């Protein structure tokens, strides 16, 4: 009976410790395909998810849940949305731009009032997010390039460039052949001159 109670207490403590994370609020100008449950990654590792999403007239406010209070995110970080595949799988990437000194922040946690003076994000802190890699932009840019190549003026200019290049190369080959012929005749002349005068 006592073992069962002790196991229950240990299970509850472990379960409570595992689920004790913190929240951040990130504002984006556009949702870029993110939604509730979207993964949040830092250095390629999943550290949380989107808990809630609120659309305003000029922006989208996202509530991010970080799974553990031990995961410290530097304030000098880029927080951006990225598409990970052609199937429109979107994630939020946190890219730290500097290393933080673990010794200076090891005694603090994200729930402490002094946390705001440190170089890490704190619980319920407000952050502005950016737009990262997006396949829609890539497709638009490719379409624009294809439209430029489809322009007849471009092909006329390209054809003129190729024609001039071919003419220049033909002239270069002719000039090179003339120079090599002249050098051959000069060699024969010098050889005969030297052989006759020696």
Curated annotation (Swiss-Prot):
GO cellular component annotations of the record: chloroplast
Key words, A-Z: Chloroplast, Plastid
Keyword NAD carried by entry: no
InterPro entries, per the entry: Mce/MlaD (IPR003399), TGD2-like (IPR039342)
Subcellular location: Plastid, Chloroplast
One Pfam family it belongs to: MlaD
Keyword Calcium belongs to the record: no
Full protein name: Uncharacterized protein ycf22
Organism: Antithamnion sp.
Record gene name: ycf22
């Amino acid at each position: 009976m006592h073992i069962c109670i002790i196991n229950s207490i240990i299970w509850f403590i472990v379960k409570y410790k595992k689920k004790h994370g913190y929240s951040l609020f990130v504002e984006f100008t556009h949702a870029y395909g993110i939604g509730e449950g979207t993964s949040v990654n830092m250095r390629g590792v999943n550290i949380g998810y989107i808990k809630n999403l609120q659309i305003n007239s000029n922006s989208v406010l996202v509530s991010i849940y970080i799974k553990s209070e031990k995961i410290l995110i530097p304030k000098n970080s880029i927080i951006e949305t990225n598409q990970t595949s052609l199937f429109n799988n979107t994630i939020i990437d946190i890219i730290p731009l500097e290393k933080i000194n673990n010794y200076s922040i090891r005694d603090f946690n994200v729930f402490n009032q002094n946390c705001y003076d440190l170089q890490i994000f704190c619980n319920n802190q407000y952050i502005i997010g950016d737009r990262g890699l997006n396949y829609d932009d890539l497709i638009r840019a490719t379409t624009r390039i294809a439209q430029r190549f489809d322009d007849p003026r471009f092909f006329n200019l390209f054809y003129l460039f190729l024609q001039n290049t071919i003419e220049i190369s033909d002239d270069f080959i002719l000039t090179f052949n003339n120079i090599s012929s002249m050098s051959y005749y000069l060699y024969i002349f010098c050889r005969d001159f030297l052989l006759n005068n020696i």
